[in-house]
Amino acid sequence: MQKKTVYLAGKITGDPFYRAKFYEAQRKLEEGGFIVVNPALLPSEGFAWEAYMRMAGAMLNECAEVCFLPDWKESKGAQREFDEAFMQEKPFFFFEEWEAKRNAGE
């Protein structure tokens, strides 16, 4: 079975611990069989917010699915990514729900 690519979406701006949060989710998703595209790997400075969103959008577009971290609604960028995924009819899921099912053995 071919692994699915998944884009990780959540709050980055204003969260000093975003890298740890994203890396932990990436680790768990990879253990679950996904190939994870993690926008937290982008440089933390040097670009305008809109430039980051264009880069993240390109990453999202290339993935089969999108996974939303619990704080995604607190992020203007992640809300925009949700809208983009919805408009593309791209499958998406919520990390908390996925993790709960995984922990329950489903």
Where are these regions (language model features)?
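Conserved catalytic or regulatory cores that recognize and/or transform ribose-phosphate-containing ligands
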Residues: 1-106
